[in-house]
């Protein structure tokens, strides 16, 4: 499942909702093929910022470009061909099978009157096997567990074959094995990945760049070793932290 990664540039992004500044002056770049982690406490603006990137919440100011194209100057059809999304929570009321959910990922790429091609179906099957949900193809989406639904949703995003993959807390509901699998997959993909996480150590281990949010602003951005300093983390999360090393060599954060 190979697709070239896109370059994402977020410049001066601001989002106001009902007169409140939810996101303010956020700048960062996700280079092709990078994994960029978005960190921050609850209410720091992570999800709102991501929605502005994938054409769901129009920004009040600033720009979002994918390979030089202003996302908000194009329609949702264009966005769905270039950006795939895994939301924090996926509605479970769909009266569809898991296979049908995954095949929805190919919809942006086909003519409305045509059926999916053999190649499309093969992509969907490969995505389901990759996420270890191939045996759920005929199961009703609403009747499987939350973790299984999350993996099916990620398979749908993979089948979409876009240069930019946005994931909002994709490891929610997943056991340790599948948390690691999702993050390892993010590293292997050639797509550019922007992922919001609460697990700082997962982010430190698997992300090339981190963007740390607090109260709607970006307080630090850069390599994990630069962003994850006790002074910054203690101030943002209001806890005491200690830095060590994971056996992989990544920074490891312990809350004291």
Regions found by a protein language model. Name each.
Residues 39-41:
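The feature captures the beta-strand-to-loop junction immediately N-terminal to the Walker
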Residues 103, 118-136:
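Conserved ABC ATPase "signature" region
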Residues 8-10, 23-25:
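Conserved structural motif at the start of ABC-family nucleotide-binding domains
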Residues 62-73, 78-79:
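Conserved ABC transporter NBD signature motif
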Residues 165-169, 174:
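Catalytic Walker B motif of ABC-type/P-loop ATPase nucleotide-binding domains
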Residues 54:
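Helix-to-loop junction immediately C-terminal to a conserved catalytic motif
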């Amino acid at each position: 499942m190979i697709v070239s990664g896109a370059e994402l540039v977020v410049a001066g992004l601001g989002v106001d909702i009902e007169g409140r500044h939810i996101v303010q002056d956020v700048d960062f770049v996700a280079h092709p093929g990078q994994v960029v982690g978005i960190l921050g406490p609850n209410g720091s603006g992570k999800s709102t910022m991501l929605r502005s990137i994938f054409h769901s919440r129009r920004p009040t100011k600033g720009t979002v470009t994918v390979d030089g194209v202003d996302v908000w100057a194009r329609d949702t059809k264009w966005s769905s061909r270039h950006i795939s999304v895994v939301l924090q929570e996926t509605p479970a009321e769909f009266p569809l099978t898991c296979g049908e959910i995954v095949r929805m990922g190919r919809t942006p790429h086909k003519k409305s009157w045509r059926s999916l091609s053999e190649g499309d179906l093969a992509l969907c099957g490969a995505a389901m096997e990759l996420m270890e949900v191939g045996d759920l193809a005929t199961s009703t989406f609403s009747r499987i567990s939350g973790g299984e639904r999350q993996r099916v949703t990620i398979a749908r995003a993979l089948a979409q074959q876009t240069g930019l993959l946005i994931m909002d807390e994709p490891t929610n509901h997943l056991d340790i094995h599948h948390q690691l699998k999702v993050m390892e997959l993010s590293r292997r993909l050639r797509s550019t990945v922007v992922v919001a996480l609460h697990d700082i150590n997962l982010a430190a281990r698997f992300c090339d760049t981190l963007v740390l949010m607090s109260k709607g602003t970006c307080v630090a951005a850069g390599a994990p070793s630069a962003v994850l300093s006790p002074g910054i983390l203690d101030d943002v999360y209001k806890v005491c932290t200690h830095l060590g090393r994971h056996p992989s060599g990544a920074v490891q954060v312990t809350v004291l």
